[in-house]
């Protein structure tokens, strides 16, 4: 339908961008795969990775990989090192607040991420982190709470994806 509108308007050429490659790292000792049938009281299903992948896929992104780590500095750092080799945008979910086992901010700093901001004045979503790695990689630290992660994705990550794909700030 969009192609028909362009042709009807006499437009024969359009500029298009490409969608970025997205890496998602979910963190948490409590996380287990959704296909595990036995769940203990201290565990929860790793729903954030799949939720964010589905949201990114819905707008047309194709290269989206998910990794899961424990609340462990070396595991988080290892996954980040792997993803920064190919990803244009990296989402690290959980472990970004002020808890005793929240290592994401420190791991990102040690991994060479330039922090642009940490914490925003919204609820849900307060512990949001944003930084950059190198020339072209954007890094978001999203809260582990699913509703907070969803809100932060739509308010902050989605606009970043669309702008990288060529959308204007106004749209």
What are these regions (language model features)?
Residues 107-171:
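Flexible glycine/proline-rich
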Residues 2-4, 34-38, 78, 102-105, ...:
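Short acidic, glycine/serine/threonine-rich loops at helix termini
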Residues 13-18, 58, 82-85, 121-122, ...:
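Solvent-exposed alpha-helices and their adjacent loops that cap or buttress functional pockets
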Residues 1-67:
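Short, glycine/charged-enriched hinge/interface segments at domain edges or termini
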Residues 43-49, 70-75, 119-128:
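A general structural motif
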Residues 51-112:
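N-terminal small/polar loop signature for handling phosphorylated ligands or for N-terminal nucleophile
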Residues 24-27, 92-93, 121, 142-143:
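Short beta-strand segments
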């Amino acid at each position: 339908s969009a192609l028909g509108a362009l042709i009807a308007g006499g437009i024969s050429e359009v500029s298009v961008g490409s969608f970025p490659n997205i890496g998602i790292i979910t963190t948490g000792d409590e996380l287990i795969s959704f296909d595990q049938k036995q769940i203990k009281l201290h565990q929860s299903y790793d729903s954030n990775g799949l939720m964010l992948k589905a949201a990114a896929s819905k707008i047309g992104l194709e290269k989206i990989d998910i990794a899961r780590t424990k609340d462990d500095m070396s595991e988080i750092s290892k996954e980040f090192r792997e993803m920064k080799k190919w990803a244009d945008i990296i989402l690290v979910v959980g472990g970004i607040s002020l808890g005793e086992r929240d290592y994401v901010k420190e791991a990102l700093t040690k991994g060479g991420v330039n922090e642009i901001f940490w914490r925003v004045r919204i609820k849900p979503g307060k512990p949001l982190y944003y930084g950059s790695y190198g020339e072209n990689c954007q890094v978001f630290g999203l809260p582990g709470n699913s509703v907070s992660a969803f809100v932060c994705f739509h308010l902050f990550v989605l606009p970043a994806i669309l702008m990288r794909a060529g959308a204007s700030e106004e749209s």
